[in-house]
Amino acid sequence: LICHNRPLPFLHKTCPEGQNICYKMTLKKTPMKLSVKRGCAATCPSERPLVQVECCKTDKCNW
């Protein structure tokens, strides 16, 4: 699986074995959904009060 891991669309990495989910965290209270963090995970990270989490399982799907 290949996931974006930086704010820029052309920067990505191959996930380590066992990490089969791409995730993207964005701030909930901003008009443009400012991205906070992207990367690979074994399980989808939990949402937080001010952070929305989106998870997916295809290459580069977390843009």
From Swiss-Prot:
Keyword annotations: Cardiotoxin, Disulfide bond, Secreted, Toxin
Cellular component aspect of the GO annotation: extracellular region
InterPro entries: Cytotoxin_Cobra, Snake_3FTx, Snake_toxin-like_sf, Snake_toxin_con_site, Toxin_cobra-type
SS bond partners: C3-C22, C15-C40, C44-C55, C56-C61
Tissue specificity: Expressed by the venom gland.
UniProt superkingdom: Eukaryota
One Pfam family hit: Toxin_cobra-type
Presence of keyword Disulfide bond: yes
Compartments where found: Secreted
Gene Ontology MF terms in the entry: toxin activity
SUPFAM superfamilies: Snake toxin-like
Record family assignment: Belongs to the three-finger toxin family. Short-chain subfamily. Orphan group XIV sub-subfamily.
Note in the entry: Is classified as a P-type cytotoxin, since a proline residue stands at position 31 (Pro-31 in standard classification).
Role summary: This toxin has a very low toxicity.
Protein name (record): Cytotoxin homolog
